[in-house]
A protein has these predicted regions:
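Generic structural signal for residues in well-ordered beta-strands
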Residues: 6, 115-117, 136
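Structured loop/turn residues at beta-strand edges in well-structured enzyme cores
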Residues: 51-54, 113, 132-134
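Short, charge-rich binding segments
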Residues: 51-52, 80-84, 108-109, 129, ...
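Metal-dependent phosphodiesterase/nuclease catalytic metal-binding core
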Residues: 121-178
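Active-site metal-binding motif and surrounding structural segment of the metallo-beta-lactamase
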Residues: 40-91, 119-121
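Active-site neighborhood of divalent metal-dependent phosphoester bond hydrolases
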Residues: 84-88, 93-121
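Alpha-helix N-cap/helix-start and coil->helix boundary motif
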Residues: 43, 53, 66, 97, ...
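Conserved beta-strand hairpin/beta-sheet module of binuclear metal-dependent hydrolase folds
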Residues: 1-49, 87, 150-152, 159
């Protein structure tokens, strides 16, 4: 079975405590990391969990309360200092791009990688990410702000069947049977 597990980096409310960090989870699907929310302190928790920063390429933000997104700028900046070159994809309400772009322009100018925004409407159920391993769908939720959950659907791995080997063993089977 392929790897599919979740790391809870934080599950606290809007006020982190000494025992609970702000909201952030990382889903590991076949060694690709997907972050769901990025509360303050998420990058420290990533290090504690011994998760490789280089495998994190997609961040999904459920809504625009600070405890779900205040860790983004620090993480983006750290990736720049680590000389990351792979693009970082942020999937969130369109307003997040409007909020982050001035900060990126001021603090992160000249980074060796791009931050790519993928805005979505949290009030609509839609597929917002799809590759050969997984698809991600938004699920609208009730909250004080437009909010959604994320449904990660793992896709089956293709069978590793070689036609030439099937033909070879079938011909052997025919010879043995005669």
């Amino acid at each position: 079975m392929e790897k599919f597990n979740i790391h809870i980096l934080g599950c606290g409310s809007a006020l982190p405590t000494t025992r609970h960090q702000a909201t952030s989870q990382v889903l590991n699907i076949r060694e690709k990391l997907f972050m769901i929310d990025c509360g303050e302190g998420a990058q420290v928790q990533l290090r504690r969990a011994k998760l490789k920063f280089s495998r994190l390429n997609h961040i999904f933000i459920s809504h625009l309360h600070g405890d779900h997104c205040f860790g983004l700028m620090g993480l983006i900046s750290t990736f720049g200092m680590l000389e990351r070159t792979a693009d970082l994809h942020i999937h969130a309400h369109a307003d997040l791009q409007r909020l982050l772009e001035p900060q990126l322009e001021f603090f992160c100018k000249g980074m060796p990688y791009q931050v790519v925004f993928h805005p979505f409407n949290p009030g609509e159920r839609t597929v917002i990410y799809d590759d050969r391993s997984v698809s991600v769908e938004t699920i609208p939720l009730r909250h004080r702000l437009p909010t959604c959950g994320f449904l990660f659907r793992e896709k089956p791995t293709p069978n590793h069947i070689r036609r030439d080997m099937i033909d070879f063993y079938r011909s052997e089977e025919r010879r043995v049977g005669k």
